């Protein structure tokens, strides 16, 4: 890789603003806010609106589409099935 053209990859703390869940991960994103983490070090803080802690897919609260779709409406309208 060429030197000087890639962004700096460093540890960053992400905080889910809807659940206040925090996790440490690597990122190239920069931030002016910092937070003291559990290990005693200070890391940049990035706020996210949704994470694996609040996303319906991961929490099990995902809504499934009902069977009342376009095909079912067509079948009801024309008396099929």
Curated annotation (Swiss-Prot):
Stated family: Belongs to the bacterial ribosomal protein bL31 family. Type B subfamily.
Gene3D superfamilies found in the cross-reference section: Ribosomal protein L31
Subunit structure: Part of the 50S ribosomal subunit.
Superkingdom of this protein's organism: Bacteria
Protein name, per record: Large ribosomal subunit protein bL31B
InterPro entries on file: Ribosomal_bL28/bL31-like_sf (IPR034704), Ribosomal_bL31 (IPR002150), Ribosomal_bL31_B (IPR027493), Ribosomal_bL31_sf (IPR042105)
Disulfide bonds: none
Entry keywords, A to Z: Ribonucleoprotein, Ribosomal protein
GO annotation terms (biological process): translation
PANTHER family associated with the record: 50S RIBOSOMAL PROTEIN L31, CHLOROPLASTIC, LARGE RIBOSOMAL SUBUNIT PROTEIN BL31C
Gene Ontology MF annotations: structural constituent of ribosome
Organism: Listeria monocytogenes serovar 1/2a (strain ATCC BAA-679 / EGD-e)
Pfam family, one: Ribosomal_L31
GO cellular component, one term: ribosome
């Amino acid at each position: 890789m060429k030197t000087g053209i890639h962004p700096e990859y460093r540890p960053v703390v992400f905080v889910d603003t809807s659940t206040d869940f925090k996790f440490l991960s690597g990122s190239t994103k920069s931030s002016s806010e910092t937070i003291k983490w559990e290990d005693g070090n200070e890391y940049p803080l990035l706020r996210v609106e949704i994470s694996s802690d609040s996303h319906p897919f991961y929490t099990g609260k995902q809504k499934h589409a009902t069977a009342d779709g376009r095909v079912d409406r067509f079948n009801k309208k024309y008396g099929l099935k």
